[in-house]
């Protein structure tokens, strides 16, 4: 068993629950978006801006972004821990992934609240 402080959850069960919870959030978000596209009729710029400007859509989008961050981090941590044995390389890859995920969420936050 690897005991490393870079895991997101406290233990494997906690990570398991986080991954399942974020998967549910992402599934609900996909259903929400597909439902919008299926029921919106003609999709114009005004319709799209109106949809993106609603508070519910903004909050749900941010929740989905944070869910992607958590889901991806736990998954990548598990893959890197299992398959990349040199510690320096694994830590460097983890750092790159964390920075990319944080930049992704910050950029998403700016885009969502910029509408």
Swiss-Prot record:
Mind listing the UniProt keywords for this protein, alphabetically? Answer: Cell inner membrane, Cell membrane, Electron transport, Heme, Iron, Membrane, Metal-binding, Transmembrane, Transmembrane helix, Transport, Tricarboxylic acid cycle
Question: Which SUPFAM superfamilies has this protein been placed in?
Answer: Fumarate reductase respiratory complex transmembrane subunits
Q: List the disulfide bonds.
A: none
Membrane topology (Cytoplasmic): 1-15, 81-90
Bilayer topology annotation: Multi-pass membrane protein
Q: Where does a ubiquinone bind?
A: 83
Describe the protein's quaternary organization and the partners it interacts with: Part of an enzyme complex containing four subunits: a flavoprotein, an iron-sulfur protein, plus two membrane-anchoring proteins, SdhC and SdhD. The complex can form homotrimers.
Q: What is this protein called?
A: Succinate dehydrogenase hydrophobic membrane anchor subunit
Gene this protein is translated from: sdhD
């Amino acid at each position: 068993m690897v005991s490393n402080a870079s895991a997101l959850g406290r233990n494997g069960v906690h990570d398991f629950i986080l991954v399942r919870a974020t998967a549910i959030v992402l599934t609900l978000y996909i259903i929400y978006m597909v439902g919008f596209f299926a029921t919106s009729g003609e999709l114009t710029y005004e319709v799209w801006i109106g949809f993106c400007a609603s508070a519910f859509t903004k909050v749900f989008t941010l929740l989905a972004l944070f869910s992607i961050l958590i889901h991806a981090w736990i998954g990548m941590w598990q893959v890197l821990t299992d398959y990349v044995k040199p510690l320096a390389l694994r830590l460097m890859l983890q750092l790159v992934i964390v920075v990319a995920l944080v930049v992704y969420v910050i950029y998403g936050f700016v885009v969502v609240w910029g509408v």
